[in-house]
């Protein structure tokens, strides 16, 4: 399924940074928590209630090129309903338009990978005919997401909707609820300390005086240290995330050379790996095919050093200059990307039944997602610069790739584990590999 099994690169960061961080034991697991509040609380970020579907004005419809789930209750209802006359291909009932795919009942897409109920005005034929109540749970809730913990429920929005990206782009910084404060009142310290860890990471990634990359590298290093020196306590978290510890850690990391060419080469592979199945199914071709062709071209040029060393050296020099220019043009979007990453931390880092290993795995996936998205920006920027002498990155282009790549990487937890286990020598990465794809 994932053909490239890459060897992790070893880097000697741990010995150089370890002196910056004191080691104490820690523990944390939600799965053994039996505390239940008398009244379930719904905790939401500050942006959640501001979302509105823009329907026919949406530039990247959610009714095309991905699986649209149909729950059992909806499917039973659809067996008794006829398709509106405006649906091009008439079948005996609405359920007849569904298929089983990867163990899930979904709407069967047409030859253009579009939902058969989507009309030319990008409106749903079912809603026009029957109203919103006819829709499946997926269509009703997207892009909303809910996680149900034993102690409370959390709601958030997913980034694979352009209207969500527009919402985040208008806010300088997103604000998330402090769940640990709520849980500390219940006396459930094992659970609250994991949520406190998440809050510490959210705060770390909210410091605009430093780069996203620096903060991701520090975050993953701290997570690895905590994982290796369990059990987890509130006091230990305060120590690891203290201003002095983070400053010393940042100084140590900044002294390490992380060659951009290695990053570009590895991110080329990552992006191609993630795209394999989508290419086979003919999905997102307009978005993916141009940048994947350039990724392949870059990979071939970088691997051609033995036959044409002078040409390769010149190519590498030009590529480095382009990367440096790109990072400058990307910097105006750092607030948006920071909002995106912090939302990923809030929504995906800590799931029901999580422990510290799960948190590490989820952080790796978030990093892989970010590295692939950023690399898709880079490749598209190179193509646009070649085609039209464009230097700046347009917001519409950035939004397009952010939406499509997050749709591509929106795996369920079991699928994330399968992908990482099939693609890497070990489920848990060395810090060096994390640093390789993130850079500094």
Residue ranges and their predicted role:
Residues 1-16:
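Single conserved hydrophobic/aromatic residue that forms the stacking wall/gate
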Residues 19-20, 29, 33:
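Serine residues within intrinsically disordered or low-complexity segments
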Residues 34-122, 126-136, 140-179:
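N-terminal cysteine/histidine-rich coordination modules
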Residues 66, 127-131, 149, 186-189, ...:
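Conserved aromatic-histidine-acidic binding/catalytic patches
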Residues 163-247:
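Charged, amphipathic alpha-helical linkers/stalks
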Residues 212-440:
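Hydrophobic, aromatic-lined core segments that form the binding pocket/scaffold
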């Amino acid at each position: 399924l994932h053909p490239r099994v890459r060897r992790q690169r070893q880097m000697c960061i741990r010995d150089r940074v370890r002196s910056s961080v004191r080691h104490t034991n820690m523990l944390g697991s939600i799965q053994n928590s039996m505390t239940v509040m008398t009244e379930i609380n719904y905790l939401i970020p500050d942006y959640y209630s501001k979302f509105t579907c823009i329907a026919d004005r949406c530039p990247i419809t959610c009714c095309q090129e991905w699986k649209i789930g149909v729950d059992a209750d909806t499917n039973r209802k659809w067996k008794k309903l006829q398709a509106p006359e405006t649906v091009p291909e008439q079948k005996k009932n609405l359920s007849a338009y569904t298929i089983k795919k990867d163990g899930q009942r979904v709407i069967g897409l047409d030859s253009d990978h579009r939902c058969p109920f989507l009309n030319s005005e990008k409106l749903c034929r079912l809603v026009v005919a029957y109203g919103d109540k006819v829709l499946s749970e997926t269509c009703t809730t997207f892009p909303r997401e809910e996680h149900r913990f034993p102690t409370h429920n959390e709601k958030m929005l997913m980034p694979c909707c352009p209207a969500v990206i527009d919402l985040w782009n208008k806010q300088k910084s997103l604000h998330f609820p402090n769940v640990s404060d709520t849980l500390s009142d219940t006396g459930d310290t094992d659970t609250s300390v994991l949520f406190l860890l998440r809050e510490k990471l959210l705060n770390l990634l909210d410091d605009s005086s430093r780069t996203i990359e620096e903060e991701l590298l520090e975050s993953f290093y701290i997570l690895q240290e905590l994982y290796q020196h369990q059990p987890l306590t509130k006091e230990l978290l305060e120590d690891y995330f203290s201003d002095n510890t983070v400053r010393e850690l940042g100084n140590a990391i900044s002294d390490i050379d992380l060659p951009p060419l290695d990053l570009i080469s590895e991110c080329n592979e990552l992006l191609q790996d993630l795209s394999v199945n989508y290419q086979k199914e003919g999905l997102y071709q307009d978005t993916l095919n141009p940048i994947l062709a350039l990724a392949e071209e870059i990979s071939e040029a970088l691997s051609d050093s033995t036959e044409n060393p002078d040409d390769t050296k010149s190519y590498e020099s030009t590529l480095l200059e382009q990367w440096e220019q790109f990072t400058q043009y990307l910097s105006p979007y750092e607030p948006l990307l920071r909002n995106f990453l912090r939302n990923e931390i809030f929504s995906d880092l800590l799931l029901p039944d999580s422990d510290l290993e799960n948190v590490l795995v989820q952080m790796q996936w978030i990093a892989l997602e970010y590295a692939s998205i950023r690399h898709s920006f880079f490749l598209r920027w190179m193509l646009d610069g070649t085609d039209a002498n464009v230097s700046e990155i347009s917001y519409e282009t950035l939004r397009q790739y952010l939406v499509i790549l997050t749709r591509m990487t929106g795996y369920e937890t079991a699928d994330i584990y399968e992908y990482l286990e099939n693609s890497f020598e070990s489920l848990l990465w060395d810090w060096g590999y994390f640093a390789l794809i993130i850079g500094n």
